[in-house]
Amino acid sequence: MRVLRYAALLLSVVTLAGCGNEVEVELVWGGPPQPDPGGVVSVNGFRTFQDNVDEHWEGSAAMAAAEFLRLDERTVTRTTIDGKASSEGTGPQTVTVTLDGLLDDSIRAERWTLGFEQVNETYRLTAALREQRCQPGRGHQEFSAEPCV
């Protein structure tokens, strides 16, 4: 659903740009879409967003992960960001973001595993997986894509 909202926003920006007025519109990423039952999250909307912006966060896989997840809008007790690059320091990178202490009755924590590929000076999101850990008594205590109760 967010992809459709983003497409509508992009269309209105293009429409405004074609009017000849010098109207500046700042594009804002709305956050990741809902995962499928296996925890896989589509990255297509974010890649389109990246195609239309030139921001400092694109130069770091960890900062791009923070933008994709909209960490600036999340309220948690603890956020952990762990980045791993290939042995030579170039090539694909994996960023794991753990959000612990969520203000939710069922879900205690979320873990996001994000794949990035460096293209010139930017890190492009290639894959996203969301797993969750349930509150005690509300389901599984290990990270899993399975829902909490």
Question: What spans do the regions from the language model cover?
Answer:
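Post-signal peptide N-terminal segment of mature Sec-exported envelope proteins
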Residues: 27-47
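Sec-dependent bacterial lipoprotein signal peptides
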Residues: 1-17
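A small/polar (G/S/T-enriched), proline-flanked helix-loop surface module common
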Residues: 44-51, 83-84, 144
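Bacterial signal peptide processing site
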Residues: 19-23
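Mature extracytoplasmic domains of secretory-pathway proteins
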Residues: 52-110
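Short beta-strand edge/turn micro-motifs at domain boundaries
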Residues: 114-143
